[in-house]
């Protein structure tokens, strides 16, 4: 059963219930001691497992989680694979935390199918699980809550921004991320559904996976540019490493600012590119809120309190016109505001 964002179109599968990276100075796997003890004197031990530990997005998730842990009296054990393509390592990490008998687990599954088994195992063992960032193909009682961006809507917003910049006409490319990633799959599907509403826009490539690193995305973008050349009027990249890779490829070809380029997620390089006119728009999540609400939800689940099945953390669009607004600056620089 596929766990979908709430605005996804009807599908012939059961919609579950209501139904997108380096941590700060901490190394992957380092425990964070936060907050005061609980009423019985026990400090909750919460495992938080991101998809990876090399992208800025996850640092912001971690930052928000620490804020909630400080308030709720919990220790966060933050650990994830170095690469977001390393499914086996994420499986090993969650299994280790299950064996360790932590009080609760927050998981961003990098594979919607493969991570279902250990999540079910954790539940059978009395360890509640909150899924964040990316959905899981599992029964509705396998986890306590899903904390995420409405990624389908984010893809739609990217398409609307692209169409506005193109004046409703042109040939565009969408670079996919990595097979098995539910969050980016939703962005991709949302983009394709929304862009189809513009008859003057032709999607000339949407089946290429750019991979989980900036380097792999740059290589794939170069291949697409080699194939289509001047035919490309616009490009949509569905996450931070892909967007940074596309940006580098466009800069190498002296095409930055000439091709309409919409990205998803943020980094310092992307924010600078938006200011300079090298990017047209950036679709932003609120990773700090995602981390914060994930810890809130897992603590409620541990305590046996009711938890909402889905917690929407919001989705926004940054442009040259609004980049200096308080809201966008907070999303671009969460640890500085």
Task: Describe each PLM feature range.
Residues 1-6, 65:
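Positively charged n-region of N-terminal signal peptides that target proteins for export
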Residues 5-8, 34:
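Intrinsically disordered, low-complexity segments
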Residues 8-20:
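Bacterial N-terminal signal peptides
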Residues 21-337:
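A residue-level marker of the well-folded mature domains of exported/periplasmic proteins
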